[in-house]
Each structure stands twice: as structure tokens, then as C-alpha cells.
């Protein structure tokens, strides 16, 4: 019994420390590869553009359709892309603002996920997500 508990604790530790991996969202890695730029910040900017285009495609849909699923995976790729920023960039005030945008995007996406089947709410949250992505991109441009 103790061996099972130890094995379970070890597996939870490994999953918890995997930080920048695609264990639960394997397609997010594909989007991160597609958006790969010369730097971590450029990759994040490419992902924000990709997400804006996908958010526009997801408008008018319902549930977890293809565009919404793509947006979901791109969202996780963007969150993980924060690990690709250099130490010097991470110490800037603009990066702190980018982290704030990340938190705001997370809150918006949670609400978007909640209302994925409620059409008027879904489109409103997609619009809000697009605005926040534009603000994030502007912030990232100051870091570069």
C-alpha cells in the first residue's frame, strides 16, 4: 500500500513539475511549432495572431466545434510559450504586464468555456478575447 502511495505521489510530482509540456494538450505542441519565431516573444506574438484568426472562425458556432477546439489548443500553446522568454525579458515591466494579460486571458477563456453552448455569450466572450489578444500583442512588441 505504501508503495502505491509513493508511486502515486511521484507521478503527481512529475505531472506538476512538467510546466511547459503538452501532456494534456498534445495538439498545443503542433501550434507552438507552427508559430515558432526567432525568440520566445516572437512565438507568443505569432500565437496571438493565430488565436485572433481562430476566434473569428469560432464566432457563430456552438459547443466544442473544430474552431473552438483549435482555439483551446492555441490558448494552451500561448500559456506554455511564456516559458520561452529570456531571463532579461522576464525582468522588464512590460513582461509583468504580459503576465497580467495572461491572467486576464485565462479568466476570459474560462468564461468562454462556460458559455460555449450559449451563442450570444460565446460571441461576446470571443470578442473580448480578441481585444485582450491585441493588447497582449502590443505589450509583447515593447518587450522585443
Which sequence ranges carry the predicted segments?
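Bacterial N-terminal signal peptides that target proteins for export
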Residues: 1-8
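Long, amphipathic, charge-rich alpha-helical segments that form helical bundles/coiled-coils
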Residues: 70-125, 132
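Bacterial N-terminal signal peptides
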Residues: 8-16
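Amphipathic, soluble alpha-helical interaction motifs
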Residues: 53-57, 81, 88, 111, ...
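Mature extracytoplasmic/luminal segments of secretory-pathway proteins
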Residues: 17-20, 80
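Short, low-complexity, Pro/Ser/Thr/Gly-rich segments in the mature regions of secreted, periplasmic
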Residues: 129-144
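Immediate post-signal-peptide N-terminus of mature secreted/exported proteins
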Residues: 20-73
